[in-house]
Amino acid sequence: MDLLVVVHIKSSYDGWKAVFDADPAGREEFADDTRTRVAKVDDNTAMVQLFDVDMQKMFEIINDPNSPVADVMADHVEKRDVYKVEQMSPPN
């Protein structure tokens, strides 16, 4: 499944991006990280495109209270809006 994630940042884009680039979640464990794309909307918003996501694995990693992701992201992320992305077929 392909996703578009709108990240609402409570620190700053640069602070969040440094953590995102360090990859404490181990994105390669649940998505094709070679295709991951990140865009800055403004200093408190980013858009992340994830491809071939294993939703179960992602859920387990992101929500594991023992994961290093939980504490680090709590300092930087207010919330995430997650959207499923599908290719559209042309109308008949």
Positions of predicted regions on the chain:
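Short, well-ordered beta-strand segments in beta-rich or mixed alpha/beta enzyme
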Residues: 2-9, 37-65
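Short acidic, gly/pro-rich beta-turn/loop elements at beta-sheet edges
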Residues: 15-17, 58-60, 92
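Helix N-terminus capping/helix-initiation residues
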Residues: 12, 42, 75-77
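Short, surface-exposed ligand-recognition loops at beta-strand->loop->(often short) alpha-helix junctions
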Residues: 8-19
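Unusually extended, aromatic-enriched hydrophobic runs near protein termini
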Residues: 1-2, 31, 49, 91-92
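Short, low-order "capping/linker" segments at domain edges
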Residues: 84-92
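An amphipathic, aromatic/His-enriched active-site/gating alpha helix that lines ligand/cofactor pockets
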Residues: 21-37, 53-84
